[in-house]
Structure formats: C-alpha cells, structure tokens
Amino acid sequence: INTVKKLKSIPLKYGTEIDVRSYNNKLILAHDPFKKGDNLNFYLKNYNHGTLIVNIKEAGIEYLVVKQLKKFKIKNYFLLDVEFPFIYKSSRKGFKNTSIRFSEEESIDTVKKYINRINWVWIDTFSKLPINKNNIKVLNKFKKCLVSPDRWNRPQDIKKYIKTMKQKNFSIDCVMTSKST
C-alpha cells in the first residue's frame, strides 16, 4: 500500500507493507527504482494502523527511515528485506525492529543466530509452509509474519496451512496477504 490514498481505504485494525527508496534526495514509497511516489513523511503522518512492514528497497537508507518512524511515533513496525550487513551491525547495537527471513530456501540456522537480537522472523512460503516440530521451537522465539500462499498464486493452500498450524499449535502475529482487507 504505497499511497496515502490507498492507505485511507484500509481499516485501522490492519497493517500495511510499504516499499521505501530514495528519489531526488527524498524518501518515497515506490516498488521500482526511478519512479515518483508519495513522500514517506506524508504517509507516516497519516498512519494510525496495525503493524507497518517497511520493505527497504535501497541499501543505505535504513537509519534515515528509522529516524522518520521515530519522528512520527510509529512503534509497531519492522524492516523487511534489508541487506544482511545492516541486520548484523544494527542488531549488535540493540536495534530489534527488523526481520530475518526463513523459508524452504533460507536456513533456520541463520534465524537461530538472531534469537534475542531481533524481534521478527519473516516466514515465506515460496512453494510450501516450511514449519516442522524442530524449527517451530526456534520460530516461537520471535514475532512471526507469515507470507500467505495467495501471494504466490496458491490461495487453495490457505486452509491447509491453517489446519497444519493448528495441529502444530503454531500461531503467527501477522500475515502478508494479497488482499487489502
């Protein structure tokens, strides 16, 4: 949800994901480079919603983005898709509002290293729900955001995933879905 106009149509109980990059020395919302977009500050000024997922689209702007989040008193957020050097350095300085990725392609061993260092794990579902009894123990040390299989054109898997999570007593804190409500 990269525009204030679209944000205003989202019920306050829901969070959103935004794509942040720089353009003409300003932080803007745009998925693709070299495109104009809404000013990040204007968006944050209008943000009164649930969890804000801040997808960093350009290395080097992370601290500038965090500064703006603090300025607008946004507390319920995490950074997504930041480069690993940022995760490494910032987590060792006490910054926890970022996420580490986990999927069938991204190792639980890396996730383990960030227990008590960061708050969030982003659980992607490229081709399947990648949870089992062993990795659930690790994942439960974090707040969890699950990518809904509808993001990968598999809406038919949603009910199966819910059933599996219930059977494994696995709960999540938020879901990234294709739907806006």
Where are the language model's segments positioned?
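Phosphate-group recognition and catalysis centered on beta-loop-alpha active-site segments
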Residues: I1-T181
